[in-house]
């Protein structure tokens, strides 16, 4: 977050969550979210106040049943010692001082998310609930690989353009609050009212028949 227009990042994150949910059409687990920043971008930006809760709730809204972290505590060495963590280096040089740790903004942000998740769990109206989108966008990894590996008139940014094209189709539904499944060519498309299949450089066996039957 905060490395570009946050709206564009939010759209990409929403589609990524929908990809995970659509794999089995079930809820998924968000495993490695950072509570503060990463350590692999050109400039590692700390999440602004309220951003951790907002991004965590976005994952829940798109079907996650958890908000888990990488990492719990920053290490003393190795390549991820400055990657974001629930517990910072603060208070870890000697005997562990919980009072110092809990006074960091990042720790309080994590506490806030935990409190909201406990409230949601107590109500029992969010965890495990499912959405049934009427719109599907076909995103096929093998099609992406084939497109990226092909040599032809245009060989620049093929992989990025595929993702950009998917996002350009996804964005209007996101803006309108319309739920979308992201399916591959092996998936069942018969139950949708609208199927969007951009940049089909490659057809898997049987997909043409599915599309003809759909229309």
Predicted segments with their positions:
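Carbohydrate-binding surfaces of carbohydrate-active enzymes
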Residues: 1-215
